[in-house]
């Protein structure tokens, strides 16, 4: 088996996790209590006869009673958000030990998440992680969900990643991170938290898929016609991307991509590991009946900034690597034609040291949408993961905000009070300046 453990940290990580497992259950025919629907049960039995290791088991563990339990852990330093899962629709899906919450929150403070409050729960979290890992025949790695801007998401995650590297050094660690949006901010100190956590986790993560709320908010508003998108609307779009990335781990397919393959194909140098995500088609239910989306259409759409889940202009950068993950009614011949057309367009530029650049995954299971959600059901979809130098725009924006506050030493006392030193801020900021330079260097011709 090649199991994956998902760890959902802080408010953003948990809310995305809740939506994620809701979608996985729909895709696999698992009811909110963990029991497989009868029709799916027959298919599952047949699948298990055909494949002794049904891909299904990479994300779910089957108990003796025949219940399917997610291989997941939810962690927060305060109980409010996790209590929502404990009392929500999927409360019977998870074992109580998978839902871990502390008594006091990190108060949007990296230092509290990493040092003071976080240090009190880290051993318990690692113990629960060990329990989940012991249930795996061949753990391939971790999927970590969090935000850069929150105290728990930034601080506690960096502490946990460090410890996971110590205990599971050979395992792949992929992150899904909510990056601070250019104009929408949930906390004034987001730039501090984001710079500190990027510095402290860079060497402990293999690949970080970034999403920003403003980009997703705009997509929901513009393409789905949602007047004021809620967190639920935003998360349901984000989890379509997560589902596309993990589909090849959960379903059999002709051109499937393994966890370690993402890293191998997307990360040319260890530090350059922040791919952007894009998704197509994004269409509302009332428009879907009037439009047909060919493989060529959806492939073209993915290279447009309006379909990307991070605010930056891909035309300003060069692509180093690109992973195209198709789902549904897609054949390789059409994909090859779409890629050839993309390469002929001048707006899509690759660095000269990586002229081929495309990795393709095809999974024949069509995408599933949430009933009553904003997205329409479609026959085929694409998720694009691209490592492009254009992402440097996002880092530059973040560093600028950090500099404005740090020049006045604004809000610094909250961090120093928790035991941090100014030197840590300077070191983190220097590391991000180096990251900007790294991206600029790889874009240059030899």
UniProtKB/Swiss-Prot annotation:
Span of the annotated motif MREC motif: 1-4
Keywords: Cytoplasm, Cytoskeleton, GTP-binding, Hydrolase, Magnesium, Metal-binding, Microtubule, Nucleotide-binding
Gene3D superfamilies: Helix hairpin bin (1.10.287.600), Tubulin/FtsZ, C-terminal domain (3.30.1330.20), Tubulin/FtsZ, GTPase domain (3.40.50.1440)
EC category name: hydrolase
Gene Ontology biological process terms in this record: microtubule cytoskeleton organization; mitotic cell cycle
Catalysed reactions listed for this entry: GTP + H2O = GDP + phosphate + H(+)
Binding-site list for Mg(2+): 78
Subunit field text: Dimer of alpha and beta chains. A typical microtubule is a hollow water-filled tube with an outer diameter of 25 nm and an inner diameter of 15 nM. Alpha-beta heterodimers associate head-to-tail to form protofilaments running lengthwise along the microtubule wall with the beta-tubulin subunit facing the microtubule plus end conferring a structural polarity. Microtubules usually have 13 protofilaments but different protofilament numbers can be found in some organisms and specialized cells.
Name the UniProt record assigns to this protein: Tubulin alpha chain-like 3
């Amino acid at each position: 088996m090649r199991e994956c453990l998902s760890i959902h940290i802080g408010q953003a990580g948990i809310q995305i996790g809740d939506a994620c497992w809701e979608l996985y259950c729909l895709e696999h025919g698992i009811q909110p209590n963990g029991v497989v629907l009868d029709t799916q049960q027959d298919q599952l039995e047949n699948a298990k006869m055909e494949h002794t290791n049904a891909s299904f088991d990479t994300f779910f563990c089957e108990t003796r009673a025949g219940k399917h339990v997610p291989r997941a852990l939810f962690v927060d330093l305060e109980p409010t958000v996790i209590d929502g899962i404990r009392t929500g629709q999927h409360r019977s899906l998870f074992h109580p030990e998978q839902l871990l919450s502390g008594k006091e929150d990190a108060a949007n403070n990296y230092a509290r998440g990493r040092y003071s409050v976080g240090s009190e729960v880290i051993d318990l979290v690692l113990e629960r992680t060990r329990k989940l890992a012991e249930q795996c025949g061949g753990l391939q790695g971790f999927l970590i969900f969090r935000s850069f801007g929150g105290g728990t998401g930034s601080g506690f995650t960096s502490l946990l990643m460090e410890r996971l590297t110590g205990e599971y050094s050979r395992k792949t660690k992929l992150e899904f991170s909510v990056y601070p949006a250019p104009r929408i901010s949930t906390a004034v100190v987001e730039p501090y938290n984001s710079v500190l956590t990027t510095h402290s986790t860079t060497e402990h993560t293999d690949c970080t898929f970034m999403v920003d709320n403003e980009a997703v908010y705009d997509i929901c508003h513009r393409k789905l016609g949602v007047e004021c998108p809620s967190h639920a609307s935003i998360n349901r779009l984000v989890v379509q991307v997560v589902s596309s990335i993990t589909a090849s781990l959960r379903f059999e397919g002709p051109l499937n991509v393994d966890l370690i393959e993402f890293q191998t194909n997307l990360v040319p140098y260890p530090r350059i590991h922040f791919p952007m995500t894009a998704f197509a088609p994004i269409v509302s239910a009332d428009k879907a009946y009037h439009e047909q989306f060919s493989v060529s259409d959806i492939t073209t759409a993915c290279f447009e900034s309006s379909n990307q889940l991070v605010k930056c202009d891909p035309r300003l950068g060069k692509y180093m690597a690109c992973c195209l993950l198709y789902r549904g009614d897609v054949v390789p011949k059409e994909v090859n034609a779409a890629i050839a057309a993309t390469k002929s367009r001048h707006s899509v530029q690759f660095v000269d040291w990586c002229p081929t650049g495309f990795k393709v995954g095809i999974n024949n299971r069509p995408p599933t949408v949430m009933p009553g959600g904003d997205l329409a059901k479609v026959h085929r979809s694409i998720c694009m993961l691209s490592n492009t130098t254009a992402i440097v725009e996002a880092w530059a924006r973040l560093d600028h905000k950090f500099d404005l506050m740090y020049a006045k030493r604004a809000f610094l006392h909250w961090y120093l009070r928790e035991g941090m030193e100014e030197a840590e801020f300077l070191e983190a900021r220097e590391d991000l300046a180096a990251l900007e330079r790294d991206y600029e260097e790889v874009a240059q011709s030899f």
